């Protein structure tokens, strides 16, 4: 069976068991291909994380492909129909961990760049790749550290295309031009442990906190806007008690998360939470963790280039969206870069038997190449 360039490179990358944060030579494979077409290769290792910054050209504007080589753990191997790191094609679908998220997109980016450079060896500006093995994990030694390094030497990205699987029903139907912010908190409410038969000698933190938690759940934080849905508050964990039926717990721990729009700031959310907790007279401690700021790329050069390319290749009028979880775009957007996420279908990401339609790989490559044409062709 003859494989296209993109499928062949995808198969090579999918054979690497690059469970986060292990890269397992994926970046070496990519770097060797890019070096052959004139990219300057700069590996950046921080802690146990491999990162790659590759650039062709020294002038602006800079178009950057961004993505990650790490994948999530496979889960139970006996639940897979085939070895997750021995990719297989069955019924027109390519199976393997990372097939959708996001090794096939990385392959498409490399092949698209090779083809564009062959046609336009003297293209304007620069083409760059920012690849990490720390997107699926803590994301502390990956893209964020590369961006910090680039910022220190005043190396700016103009446009950034992240190859996350953005499509929903067919290739290119959705592109992400922003993401909501993510704010996490661990709330500890102090009570006084005691016997359930003597509640007057104890203070039940579950009872005391319940009205405050109910108010937090019912609060309308904002109404969203044209690009973002309303801010969402979700409690993910509650823990209290010793396991005994006759003991009033001495403390309650609640974990919750905000996915928030550009209508509010993290500081405003924190302030309102404290106001509600204080109003209910709770004795508490709260630890906040901001895991991502919201970002938005309005319609402009990058969005137009992507929409035009998708329409030309697939005939699809794409829809802009900010739904879904966080991505590494949150580290790149604050530099002033226009950021867009565009990749294959996301229906099976992180699942057993993750797969992608083989017939989407070459059109995705064509879309990426046309975006380069639209922005950097002389």
From Swiss-Prot:
Binding positions for Zn(2+) 1 per the UniProt entry: 68, 101, 164
Protein name as it appears in the record: Succinyl-diaminopimelate desuccinylase
EC number: 3.5.1.18
Subunit structure: Homodimer.
Listed Gene3D superfamilies: Zn peptidases
Cofactor binding remark: Binds 2 Zn(2+) or Co(2+) ions per subunit.
A Pfam family this chain is assigned to: Peptidase_M20
UniProt enzyme class: hydrolase
